[in-house]
Regions:
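Extracytoplasmic, non-cytosolic globular domains
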Residues: 159, 163-167, 203-218, 222, ...
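Fungal eukaryote-biased detector of long internal structured cores
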Residues: 75, 86, 90-220, 235, ...
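Catalytic cores of eukaryotic secretory-pathway lumenal/extracellular enzymes that build
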Residues: 222-236
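Extended, leucine-rich alpha-helical cores of fungal transcription factors
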Residues: 10-17, 79, 83, 88, ...
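Membrane-interfacial loop- and helix-cap regions that link adjacent transmembrane helices
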Residues: 233-238, 245-246, 252, 304-305
């Protein structure tokens, strides 16, 4: 993503919530590199990488992570939907996790001032959502966007579980009461916010929120007949129950919940959280056709892909929005977190993490090893769809399904496009849906509801009034973008980690 040929080919930047996730990937990558240093004395089995090389990569990434703290457009994302805010929370908690692991390895300390700033950024954005769990409709859950009619969707609530448990496990505390995302926020918006409360590390509130959220999520039947998580629930006029389900299936909705389940086990030692994760992962893998024995049937749509390769509905149709272009990478990022080895010894960084007995650790390892071939298969498919700039495309399975494509380009393959299942609203890739019932906006919200514009889209001064999904079509954004490359990084890092963990067991 950082090579000059890439940037000479593309000049688009990402929308803000995706930028937060891309920065999360940098921190996660630095954690993976640190684990190599810790576990292998600085050398990766079967690789020529050395400790100085790895340290150099870590430093390069960290410089960019740190600089993005000041460059992040926090004012824009602060006013977006509730899901957007939580990507920022996870972004800076992941940076803190990296710093904790690296400092424990080096017996040193990166700037404590950085840790305080990362923690405060996470605190500011968590504060936006921590009191939004609303029992007046659906018995609980968080509404996607207050500008819309009530819609309690999977991603917002999965993120609340994941961000809450991440705050409980890794947030170091924050006594800075400044509630504003930027110094100019009050003057720019003519808004005065109440001071932030002090927040202690491992505050029970975080754990309570995570448990409460997951209990509610399970009670609402977010899964279809296949066991895949659907997008969300509307509340009909005059009703209080979630009575109209959107059957749309997206890959990222199957993923974010996994890191939350892993965190809940670390905080409670309740094995049911891991068991729920194993069940969902098995469902997703089956839904890509991976376990289909007949080759001709494996090439048929299985619910979330074919030929063992994850795919979103928009991939073959080539109508993915910027949002959707990152979805698969998000899935594999959170799968990777879920499959980190269970701790059996007191961690280097003292916290609230529970310890697994030998049988539980072995069972977890066996489950995750069984996923490795499928993860690697997806990584290989992703890198097979690079263009002349070595940028990974959005539809990882195109070459397996479109034999006429041999140049890395991606275009609509309508004979492979799959009709949406009945009752599905694909609001991510068709924001015009937001103008109609049951989505009708209470104010102008199409831009805010889907995620907001990119920070630099080359579309002129009126760009901020146009939904970014329309910007994608208007500015000619191709199928190989910073977003699709970020998605590729997600699956490649996961494949690297899964393979490394298996290699380490045999050395």
């Amino acid at each position: 993503m950082q090579a000059p040929p890439y940037w000479s080919g593309y000049n688009w930047t990402s929308i803000q919530w995706i930028s937060a996730f891309l920065n999360t990937e940098l921190s996660a990558t630095d954690r993976s590199l640190t684990e190599i240093l810790v576990e292998n004395d600085g050398s990766l089995p079967g690789s020529s990488f050395s400790a100085p090389t790895i340290d150099s990569e870590i430093s390069k990434h960290y410089t960019q992570i740190r600089s993005f703290l000041d460059g992040e457009d926090t004012e824009q994302i602060f006013g977006a939907a509730y899901d957007d805010a939580q990507w920022v929370v996870l972004e800076w908690i992941e940076a803190i996790k990296f710093m904790n692991e690296y400092d424990a390895y080096t017996n040193g300390s990166r700037s404590l001032d950085d840790v305080r700033k990362f923690a405060h950024r996470a605190h500011v954005f968590y504060n936006l959502v921590q009191n939004q769990f609303d029992t007046s409709t659906c018995g609980g859950g968080i509404t996607w966007n207050p500008a819309l009619e009530p819609y309690k969707n999977a991603i917002t609530n999965e993120l609340f579980m994941a961000s809450s448990i991440a705050m409980y496990l890794y947030f170091p505390g924050d006594y800075n009461t400044d509630p504003y995302p930027t110094a100019n926020y009050s003057s720019d918006t003519n808004t005065t916010l109440p001071s932030l409360p002090f927040m202690q590390p491992h505050d029970p509130l975080f754990l309570d929120n995570a448990i409460k959220e997951y209990d509610w999520f399970k009670s609402q039947n977010f899964t279809n007949e296949q066991g895949l998580i659907v997008d969300g629930f509307h509340v009909s006029k005059g009703q209080t129950a979630c009575d109209e389900r959107n059957e749309m299936v997206y890959s990222y909705n199957q993923g974010v919940i996994l890191s939350g389940l892993r965190g809940l086990w670390e905080a409670t030692a309740d094995p049911s959280y891991l068991a729920d994760g194993y069940d969902l992962i098995a469902t997703v893998i089956d839904a890509t056709g991976w376990n289909t024995q007949d080759a001709s049937k494996a090439s048929e749509w299985a619910g979330l892909g074919r030929n063992g390769i994850m795919e979103d509905y928009c991939d073959a149709a080539a109508n993915c929005s910027q949002d959707a272009q990152i979805f698969k990478g998000i899935y594999f990022h959170h799968l990777d977190i879920f499959c980190e080895p269970l701790p059996t010894e007191t961690p280097l960084v003292q916290g609230v993490t529970v310890l697994a007995d030998g049988d539980m650790a072995a069972t977890h390892s066996e489950h995750c090893e069984s996923y490795a071939a499928w993860v690697t298969h997806n990584a290989e498919a992703a890198i097979s769809n690079r263009d002349q700039y070595n940028v990974i495309g959005g539809w990882w399975g195109e070459k397996q399904n479109n034999k006429n494509n041999d140049d890395g380009s991606q275009s609509a393959t309508l004979d492979m496009a799959v009709p949406l299942s009945p009752g599905s609203w694909d609001v991510v890739n068709d924001p015009s849906i937001l103008d109609h019932e049951p989505w009708t906006c209470e104010r102008s919200c199409r831009q805010e509801a889907v995620g907001g514009p990119s920070s630099d889209n080359g579309s002129g001064s009126d760009a901020t009034s146009i939904p970014h999904t329309e910007l994608q079509k208007r500015d000619g954004r191709p199928s190989h973008t910073v977003d699709t490359q970020g998605s590729g990084v997600g699956v490649l890092r996961a494949a690297s980690d899964f393979t490394r963990r298996m290699l380490e067991k045999t050395v």
